[in-house]
Structures are given as C-alpha cells and as structure tokens.
Amino acid sequence: EEVCLALEKAKAAGAYTVAVTGREENPIAALGDRVVAYGAECIWEAHLLVAYAFVLEFLRRVAPHPELERIAADLTKLPGVLARLVAGWEEKGRALGERASRWPFLYTVAAGPLKPLAYKEGIVTLLEFTWTHGSCLDAAEFRHGPLEVAEPGVPFLFLLGTDESRHTAQRALDFVRRHTDDVIVFDHREIGEGLHPWLAPMTLFVPLEWFCYYLSLHKDHNPDHRRYYGGLAEY
C-alpha cells in the first residue's frame, strides 16, 4: 500500500519511476514508468543487486572512479560466493541458532554499510519471523547508552565489515566481550572471500538467514506463521 502511494506521488510530482518487483503482475508494476521484474525468491538479495546496479551506473556516468569498477567486477563473483555460503553454512547456522534460542532477546549491532542489514535481521527477521524480542544498535552510538546494559546474560549479535567502519564495530565488540560471553559474530573478513567491503551486506545475508531460520525452529516456531501480518488483522 505504502509503496503504491509513494509511486503515485512521485509520478504526480513529475519524477521518472522504476517499479522493482518479483512478479510483473504485482500492483506496483502498473504504476512505474519502467518495471524490473527479477523473478527470484530471495527478495532482499535481489533488491540489493538492483539498487547497486542503479547506483553504480549513475555514479559511473556522473563521477567515474576506479573504486566503482572494483565493486562492479566483484559483483560478477557474487553468485559463486553466495552459492558456497548457501551450501556451506547450514550446519553453522543450525548450531548458532540453537545457542541463541536460549536467549529471550537479542541486540544486533553494526556500523557503516552493514547497518541496513542489521536492521533487516535485528528488527524485521528476529521480530517477524522468529518472534524474538530485539533491537538494532548503531556501533557508532554504542558508547552513548547501549554500553550500560552490557553484562552477563545480555546477548549481542555483531556484524563486522571490512570497510572503514570496522574499527567502530570492533571497539563495541571488544567492550561487550569484556562483560558477557553471550556474543555471536558474523564477519565479512572471514566469509566474504575477499569481495569488496561494500558487498558485505550481500555475503553476510546468507549466514544470517540460516541462523535466523534455525533460531526459529529451535524455539518451536514456524517462521512462516503470522498472527497479524498480511491482512490477518486490521492495521
């Protein structure tokens, strides 16, 4: 509903619009000047890839830079890396999910380009799909409040990238580890196979999905079950 209204308002204001959707029969497809129908089930990865393609092409035209070419080159390597993560991370995700299932809540911490993924996993996935109470914290703001709750029994999930913000997230992680052992870390340096730092949201997404899937199952909760979402209750 909100996306359709946004497209209508954008067109009314004279903006050129592109509707990005998994299926051409989606209502938003009729509202865009152009449609990108990606036809894939993994919508978060697909949305990221489309967004990166738009931004890369725009920047190449208005402000060419060698770093843009590095990102574009590494995008072609991404399918192979993701396939290996899908095949190789299930058991690790199962073990981590079982561990986290004993915690009543979970704080997700990240910085830089991983902050949107931290929101997606720490808010959307944990709350909607696993019914786990939690919050998403910006590592850059960790010392301004969140550090006060670090103590034994308080669990944290950290996402570490390889960009310039790594120092900020690592500093928060080091502090937390001095006060609690209930910490899980997903690190692009360990799983990203050397891909560009700005592709970290795409690589970390796969292990996090395995983790959240098994977290839900170990809590005896069907991740597809909803009480209110999708028109089940008035909102």
Task: Report residues per predicted region.
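Glycine-rich, anion-gripping cofactor-binding loops and their flanking helix/strand elements
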Residues: 1-6, 144-174, 196-205, 212
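Short alpha-helical scaffold segments that flank and stabilize functional sites
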Residues: 9, 13, 125-126, 210, ...
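Active-site phosphate/pyrophosphate-binding segments
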Residues: 36, 40-46, 50, 56-139, ...
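Predominant activation on well-ordered alpha-helical scaffold segments within soluble catalytic domains
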Residues: 51-56, 120-127, 170-173, 205-213
